[in-house]
Regions:
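N-terminal Rossmann-like FAD-binding beta1-loop-alpha1 element of flavoenzymes
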Residues: 2-28, 424-428
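Glycine-rich loop(s) and the adjacent beta-strand/alpha-helix scaffold that form part
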Residues: 178-224
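A glycine-rich dinucleotide-binding beta-alpha-beta segment and adjacent secondary-structure elements
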Residues: 124-127, 132, 152-154, 326-406
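A conserved short coil-to-beta-strand element within the FAD-binding core of flavoproteins
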Residues: 124-162
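Short hydrophobic core segments
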Residues: 4-6, 29, 173-189, 201-202, ...
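Glycine-rich active-site loop/strand segments that organize a redox cofactor
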Residues: 46-94
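Glycine-rich FAD pyrophosphate-binding loop
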Residues: 20-44
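An anion/pyrophosphate-binding glycine-rich loop and adjacent beta-alpha core
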Residues: 33-41, 49, 55-56, 91, ...
Length: 429
């Protein structure tokens, strides 16, 4: 079978290698000079290749459409990803949060391994401009879902087209029995993610869920963030509120920046943002999650007793990082010259509330150019979850970030690319 893979990224190269091992003839179209450029920026240049967890545990970390992955992840779980890369000569290690990295800490090693895996495919430097679609004379029909009792006899229309190839941006036509769109999303456009796959999908009448940046830093006009820029907080709890109601909570690390907040906690929280024109978002940071409010009050009382003659700011030396101390005192509203032994119980209670509920207003998402992934994409309702084949066009398939499936940080999104690519290759007939 002639297989055409559009996109030479993580999903594309994985699919190409797997299809080669099924005995197929494979061509990869890649419009960038070098394939898999985005791999080099993942995991801060170290490439968090997957997460060492079970398929069941994995699905709890998938933010959008986890059920779509039941089949592909079951057939190609993280353990198989690790086994594959080790067979390609990559030594792996498991770090905190079961994140899997190459021992070398070099993303280039993962990129080279994928290129070796796809060795034998014809990698062509060209983009994809247009799907070659042939209308089906009598679209095949599929029975309506059994859970729809109102229309038991109604038929759902089958594919209206057959995809027989792609016309490249060069004008050249590439004919194929199976065309896989694995072009990624819109994040990190300098690495080649320019949204071409969305345009191709729409040519076959696919529904597109609006692509938005996800796993991205958050913008806050709160001046306190800029005052603390560069401050990294560890072992804090971040709770994201939408219109006053908590919608996300997690403990970990975060960072204050000149434009707002960033770091792992922030990236995960960003995937829960909806329409920012319709909703108000705030982040609340618990600076001492290991202590209850009463325990923190007692801790503050002890510290202030030991540092009785220090100023209010000086008395915070054991409680907060130095760059946060003056900001805390200002938000606390206490006279900086106040001595620790002059601070009232009521003021200590106010300090407890500030430390347990440090508020950051969220004004915007970071842009797509700096997002780790794109949320949104080709609607999974129109893609077969076992084969990755389009329900709109026979011979057309999708894998990876181009699909409306995304997860938190931790190696989950690359694993989604790998397992959907493997499902495509392993179901070719």
């Amino acid at each position: 079978m002639k297989v055409l893979v559009v996109g030479g990224g993580a999903a594309g190269l994985m699919a190409a290698g797997a299809a080669l091992r099924q005995g197929h003839e494979v061509t990869v179209l890649e419009h960038m000079e070098k394939p898999a450029q985005k791999i080099l920026v993942t995991g801060k240049g170290r490439c968090n290749v997957t997460n060492d967890c079970t398929a069941e545990e994995f699905l709890h970390h998938v933010r959008t459409n986890p059920r779509f992955l039941f089949s592909s992840l079951g057939a190609f779980p993280p353990a198989k990803t690790m086994e594959l890369f080790e067979s390609l000569g990559v030594e792996l290690k498991v770090e905190r949060g079961r994140r899997v990295f190459p021992v070398s800490d070099k993303a280039e090693e993962i990129r080279q391994a994928l290129l070796r895996y796809a060795d034998g495919a014809d990698i062509v430097h060209d983009g994809a401009k247009k799907l070659l679609l042939e209308p089906l004379a009598q679209p095949e029909e599929a029975p309506a879902a059994p859970e729809n009792p109102r229309h038991p006899k109604k038929k759902k229309p089958g594919p209206a087209y057959r995809c027989v190839g792609v016309r490249g941006t060069s004008g050249r036509e590439y004919k194929a029995d199976a065309v896989l769109v694995a072009t990624g999303g819109l994040s990190y456009p300098t690495t080649g993610s320019t949204g071409d796959g969305y345009k191709l999908a729409q040519q076959a009448d696919h529904t597109l869920v609006e692509p938005v940046p996800s796993l991205v830093s958050l913008v806050s006009h709160d001046a306190d963030c800029k005052k603390m820029m560069g401050l990294a907080l560890k072992n804090v709890t971040l709770t994201l509120h939408e219109d006053g109601k908590p919608i996300f909570e997690e403990q970990g690390e975060m960072l204050f920046t000149h434009f707002g907040i960033s770091g792992p906690l922030t990236l995960s929280a960003s995937s829960h943002l909806g329409d920012m024109k319709k909703h108000k978002y705030e982040a609340f940071i618990d600076l001492k999650p290991a202590l209850s409010e009463e325990q923190l009050y007692d801790r503050i009382t002890r510290d202030f007793a030991l540092l009785a003659n220090h100023t209010a700011q000086g008395a915070l030396v054991k409680l907060l990082p130095s760059s946060m101390q003056p900001v805390m005192v200002a938000r606390w509203g206490i006279d900086p010259a106040t001595r620790a032994n002059q601070i009232t119980r009521e003021q200590k209670r106010e300090l407890v509330q500030l430390m347990k509920h440090w508020r950051v207003t969220i004004d915007a998402r970071g842009d797509l150019a700096h997002a780790v992934i794109t949320s949104g994409g080709v609607s999974v309702r129109e893609v077969d979850p076992k084969t990755m084949q389009s329900k709109k066009a026979l011979g057309l398939y999708f894998a990876g970030e181009v699909l409306d499936v995304d997860a938190y940080t931790g190696g989950y999104n690359l694993q989604i690319a790998f397992c959907t690519a493997q499902s495509f290759a392993n179901h070719l007939e």
